[in-house]
Amino acid sequence: VYTAMCYENGCMLDDGTLFKFGQDNFRWIGGDEYSGEWLKEQAKKKNYKVWIKSATDHIHNIAVQGPNSRKILEKFVWTAPIQPSITELEWFRFNISRIDHETGTPIVISRTGYTGELGYEIWCHPKDANEVWDKVWEAGKEFDITPLGLEALDMVRIEAGLIFYGYEFNDQTD
């Protein structure tokens, strides 16, 4: 689910996507590193018995955005029958897939992005990032895929009306 993370006074600390991987297993993908520290502070204050850690160094992300993003992923993503396929994946949902076949490199694919277009994000272990990039690049050639830098991403995010901490909101925004 996409949501705001708010202080007790209602002002926004961050925005992001919260994934539920299991009964007691969640992943917060936000824009500000401090949000993880804030979650730890809240858990400590409330005496929650939880484990909160940063996974930034353990997960890489490649965004595949645009009208052909689904077709690109369908060329190399294998999904078990018990998981939603790329075609069936709804906004802010994810699946656990593999590259090419059932014993391929494990990946998580979410129907998320920062462009306002049809799009997906592929989450993988850092050791697999080059393989994932190469698969996306090869599958995207027939669609004239183009890498997108942060400046261009910022422009499409603004055009789509998507907010970013420090620009469209801060800890004084409620």
Task: Please state what every model-predicted region is.
Residues 1-6, 11, 151:
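Acidic, proline/glycine-enriched N-terminal capping motif
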Residues 19-174:
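Conserved, structured C-terminal
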